[in-house]
Design a protein with these regions (language model features):
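ATP-dependent carboxylate-amine ligase
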Residues: 1-144
Length: 144
């Protein structure tokens, strides 16, 4: 779980983890709403270059339509065939972890320590750590 929400920070995280990965390097990420739209396609370029798999999802859409954010991110990928767009960050985390192998490294980027998701001007309780814990428990049961 990392707060990386800028292209440079995301590249640093992925480069660092790549060196320690024997399996795939996969991640969930999104871009915040009502913020710099120009970095959205740049984030996609970094992910496409450095990750083996990606689920794009919500990351504090605030008052912006999440589909517009997805479109901006989609524009940065040269090929979206291996990119999955999932509305609902909890669902994206669960889906990515459920499909992971034991030697994969999973990155949940963008929210870090935050314990909320800001949607339509309201903060809703949400934690990547809590969602990952639930998904990892389910993964362990499925792979026991």
């Amino acid at each position: 779980v990392d707060y990386a929400h800028k292209p440079e920070a995301l590249a640093t995280v992925l480069d660092t983890l790549r060196a320690a990965t024997s399996g795939r390097l996969v991640l969930v990420f999104g871009c915040g709403g009502d913020r710099d739209r120009g970095k959205r396609p740049l984030m996609a370029e970094v992910v496409e270059r450095l990750a083996d798999g990606v689920l794009v999802t919500d990351d504090n859409p605030r008052t912006e339509d999440p589909s517009v954010i997805f479109d901006d991110i989609r524009a940065g990928f040269s090929n979206v065939d291996n990119v999955t767009f999932v509305a609902g960050r909890g669902q994206a985390i669960a889906q990515l972890i459920a499909g992971a192998s034991a030697d994969d490294v999973i990155v949940l980027a963008g929210k870090g320590h935050e314990d909320y998701q800001e949607i339509n001007g309201e903060r809703h309780a949400f934690s990547d750590l809590v969602e990952a814990d639930h998904a990892l428990t389910a993964w362990e049961v499925a792979h026991a």
